[in-house]
Amino acid sequence: LSADGTITPSNVNVNLQSALGSEPIQVLRTESAILLVERGGTKIREFVFDFATQSYQSPVVTQLIEHLLRSGIRAMARTANPEQTIWVVTNDGLLLSCSYRREEEVIAWAQHPTSGTVESVSTNYGAAADEVWIVVDRYGTRRVERLDVEHWERIEVDTSYHLDAAKVTTGDGLTVITGLDHLEGQLVAVHADGADLASRVGVAGQITLTDPADLVVGVLL
């Protein structure tokens, strides 16, 4: 069948390549393989052609994180720029990533802990790099958050931070930080002028600092 041909019963021959089955979760296409969730939802397999056996193979790529996938896989997505990464959300709200470079035999999984539970993940093209967007339920409030794709471009101590749901505020001699309604009643970590300060509880959408600062980041722990 050519690329511009029409599919008919007489010109298509579909052969069974695997008896494992798959979940109704969008498969991911990489440069050399297809990634799919096996029926049952607790394993991710490659679907790739093996020239040695002249047949399709479906090896498991999640052997080392089976304990994290017991609740099942809810969604997955892929970024390719600057590095190829597979993103996975589980039914119990975990966010996992996998540095995936099949040609170099690299399959490296990591967990990204955060307060609340992650419900979904999606990726989009960005100007500097592919963007990762997630839906997070934090204490009964759902919000859409984006991973900072330019985080590793900022290595200055004063502007670097490793925080979730963060709000950055700049000014001269700041003592009252507002706009923290999404952190109401929660313990907020404070990173000001390159130093970690004592945590505070968000009240009426704001926190008060003991000492003035020029750059402040607050985050839900």
Feature map (PLM): residue ranges:
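Carboxylate/His-rich catalytic cores and anion/metal-binding grooves
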Residues: 1-47
